[in-house]
Amino acid sequence: MSDIIKQIEEEQMKKDVPAFRPGDTLEVKVWVIEGTKKRLQAFEGFVIAIRKRGLNSAFTVRKISNGEGVERVFQTHSPIIDSITVKRRGAVRKAKLYYLRELTGKAARIKERLN
């Protein structure tokens, strides 16, 4: 039974997901449906958490919009995600960057990874 589930999950997983880590700045383009119209919306911010669970994988992106922190959790293999682009690589030493929620201004910056 579990072989059938694994096979179905592998078929539904996206192959074009770029490699990214917490601290990286991403631009996620998402399909938004408003009434009968369908359009692409970009959400750009840095990754504060990644959950790797095969088809159920997810990542959390945080950005500051008009002085307010906005976080959005994306399912990695969701059909509403059109593309994921890595804009900048960040150098951090933790897997979960929840402590950045409390920081503001220059303290909330992430250094750039050079490699």
From Swiss-Prot:
GO molecular function: structural constituent of ribosome
Gene3D superfamilies documented for this protein: 2.30.30.790
Keyword Ribonucleoprotein included in the entry's annotation: yes
Organism: Hamiltonella defensa subsp. Acyrthosiphon pisum (strain 5AT)
Protein name: Large ribosomal subunit protein bL19
Matches recorded under InterPro entries: Ribosomal_bL19, Ribosomal_bL19_CS, Ribosomal_bL19_sf, Translation_prot_SH3-like_sf
Swiss-Prot/TrEMBL keywords: Ribonucleoprotein, Ribosomal protein
Family to which the UniProt record says this protein belongs: Belongs to the bacterial ribosomal protein bL19 family.
Highest taxon of the lineage: Bacteria
GO BP: any one term: translation
Pfam families, alphabetized: Ribosomal_L19 (PF01245)
Entry annotated with the keyword Transmembrane: no
Gene Ontology CC entries for this record: cytosolic large ribosomal subunit
Biological role: This protein is located at the 30S-50S ribosomal subunit interface and may play a role in the structure and function of the aminoacyl-tRNA binding site.
